[in-house]
Design a protein with these regions (language model features):
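Short alpha-helical donor nucleotide-sugar binding micro-motif in glycosyltransferases
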Residues: 83, 91-97
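A short, well-ordered alpha-helix in the C-terminal region of glycosyltransferases
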Residues: 164-178
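A conserved mid-protein helix/loop that constitutes part of the nucleotide-sugar donor-binding site
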Residues: 20-43, 49, 53, 60-66
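Aromatic "clamp/platform" in nucleotide-sugar-dependent glycosyltransferases that forms part
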Residues: 105
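Short hydrophobic beta-strand element within catalytic cores of glycosyltransferases
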Residues: 122-126
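C-terminal amphipathic helix plus adjacent low-complexity
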Residues: 184-257
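Nucleotide-activated donor-binding/catalytic signature segment of Leloir-type glycosyltransferases, i.e.
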Residues: 66-84
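Conserved acidic donor-binding segment of nucleotide-sugar-dependent glycosyltransferases
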Residues: 137-138, 142-148, 157-162
Length: 257
């Protein structure tokens, strides 16, 4: 991505040249570890560090996350950009940033980490998380513990070390990023292994369900439906009884009170 395009993507935001830019791309959901990011940014700001943090995306927790950033007085450091659906725009964000922050333990395999690596951008990840698979700490990415203090400590340690960040990002590009061509080749190779094992009889045959099995399933479903019908009938009787009781109470109220 040309430098002009990378800088144009942040137009309208206060992103000074030379100031470290941290990036998150994805859905704005608390379970992705975004509270860790915001709390870490607060620690950096309180420590006198100058930086910028940009969230690119949207989500059902977006309003709460923005409100929390405001509560932490991070309005001059943290910005929320609109979700990017154009690949060139997403790529420009990756090329514009200095570090990609992804402290999620929810994601099984962070595709955004691969996207960042494709653009030569190193990621900060939770040690032991699924997203950290294939990452070697300090070589093609960085690990932290699952808390804001750990993230802030790492970012302080890396502050101003742009040459190191570029080198780790280049390593990520070489070692983590997998092109579609490579992915297809890997998938085909695995399918060939499966087919060959099948031809050699290495997979035990699976018996098809018997008629008796289906009969038991049918009886079970019939019993469930009968129980459901009984519960619905009972609910109707209870509602009818409650209505009658309410009517009698109202009558007593009118007579004696």
């Amino acid at each position: 991505v040309p430098d002009a395009a990378a800088h144009a993507v942040g137009a309208g935001l206060d992103l000074p040249e030379g100031v470290p830019l941290f990036l998150f791309v994805g859905r704005l959901m608390w379970y992705k570890g975004l509270r860790i990011i915001l709390d870490a940014m607060k620690l950096l700001k309180d420590g006198g560090y100058d930086f910028r943090m940009v969230f690119v995306g949207k989500g059902t927790d977006g309003d709460e996350i923005k409100a929390y950033a405001k509560e932490l007085s991070l309005g001059d450091k943290v910005f929320f950009a609109a979700p990017a659906y154009d690949r060139d725009v997403v790529r420009a964000w990756y090329c514009r940033a200095d570090l990609f922050l992804f402290p999620s333990t929810f994601d099984t395999n962070g595709l955004v980490v691969r996207e960042a690596a494709a653009c030569g951008l190193a990621s900060v990840l939770i040690a032991g998380s699924c997203a950290a698979e294939d990452i070697t700490d300090g070589k093609n990415g960085f690990f932290i513990e699952e808390n804001a203090a750990s993230m802030a400590a790492l970012l302080k340690k890396l502050y101003g070390k742009r040459a190191l960040l570029r080198q780790v990002g280049e390593n990520a590009q070489k070692e983590i990023y997998i092109s579609w061509e490579s992915s297809v080749r890997r998938a085909c190779a695995r399918y060939e292994v499966v087919l060959e094992n099948f031809r050699r009889g290495l997979y035990p045959p699976h018996d098809a369900p018997s008629d008796e099995f289906y009969r038991h399933v049918s009886e079970y479903l019939a019993a469930v439906n009968r129980a459901r019908s009984g519960l619905l009938e009972l609910r109707g009787d209870v509602q009818k009884g409650c209505a009658q009781l309410t009517e009698k109470l109202d009558d007593l109220w009118d007579r004696f009170l």
